[in-house]
Design a protein with these regions (language model features):
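Pyridoxal 5′-phosphate
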Residues: 1-182
Length: 182
C-alpha cells in the first residue's frame, strides 16, 4: 500500500520486456505517426501513455511516496507485521470466524466469513455501524470465490495508521455481529 490518491500507482516493466510489448489502447502522445495504412508508436514508455496524463494524481502520488520515505518503509513494514501477528492471535480466539488465505508471508489483510448463515454484507454493515470499515463482496475475485465455495467474504486491511486498539474494536464488533447473526 502506497497511500496515494485513487487511481494512482506505478508499474515496473523491464526495458527488454517493454520493447516486446504492444500498446493495448490508443491516444495522444503515444503515436509518432499515423496514416490510413499504418501506425508508428513513440518509444517506450511513451507508447503506453495514451491520452491526457493524470497530473494531479501523479503529483499526489509523489507526495505520498515522499511521506512514506520520510517515515521509512522498514518501520512501516515492522508496524504492519506487528498488527498482523496481533490480529491473527485475536482471530484465533473466535472459533466461528473462518479466515481465508493464511500464507505465512502475507500482508496485514484478512478475508473472513462467519460459520452459519451470516452473509458478508450483513457482517460488514453491523461492523460499520460500530465504527469499523471493512470491505464485503467478491473483491473482484469471483473465480477464486467459486473455487473456495464462497459467494463473498469480509476483508479487513491494516496499515501504518492502524493500532491494536482498532483490532480489538473490530474483534468486539465481530463478536457482536456473531451474537446477532450466528
Amino acid at each position: 500500500k502506497l497511500y496515494g490518491p485513487s487511481g494512482s500507482g506505478a508499474l515496473y516493466i523491464r526495458q527488454d520486456r517493454m520493447e516486446e510489448m504492444q500498446p493495448f489502447m490508443g491516444g495522444g502522445d503515444m503515436i509518432r505517426e499515423v496514416s490510413r495504412e499504418f501506425v508508428s508508436y513513440n518509444d517506450s514508455p511513451h507508447k503506453f501513455e495514451a491520452g491526457t496524463p493524470s497530473i494531479v494524481e501523479a503529483i499526489g502520488f509523489g507526495v505520498a511516496l515522499e511521506y512514506l520515505m520520510k517515515i521509512g518503509m522498514a518501520d512501516i513494514q515492522k508496524h504492519e507485521s506487528k498488527l498482523k501477528v496481533y490480529a491473527e492471535k485475536e482471530f484465533e480466539n473466535l472459533d466461528w470466524l473462518e479466515t481465508q488465505g493464511n500464507a505465512p508471508d502475507k500482508g496485514a489483510i484478512f478475508s473472513f466469513t462467519m460459520q452459519g448463515a451470516a452473509h458478508a454484507h450483513d457482517i460488514s454493515t453491523i461492523v460499520d455501524r460500530r465504527g469499523i470499515a471493512v470491505r464485503a463482496g467478491h473483491h473482484c475475485a469471483q473465480p477464486l470465490m467459486e473455487h473456495l465455495g464462497l459467494n463473498a467474504t469480509c476483508r479487513a486491511s491494516f496499515g501504518m495508521y492502524n493500532s491494536t486498539e482498532e483490532i480489538d474494536q473490530l474483534t468486539s464488533s465481530l463478536e457482536f455481529a456473531y451474537e446477532l447473526l450466528g
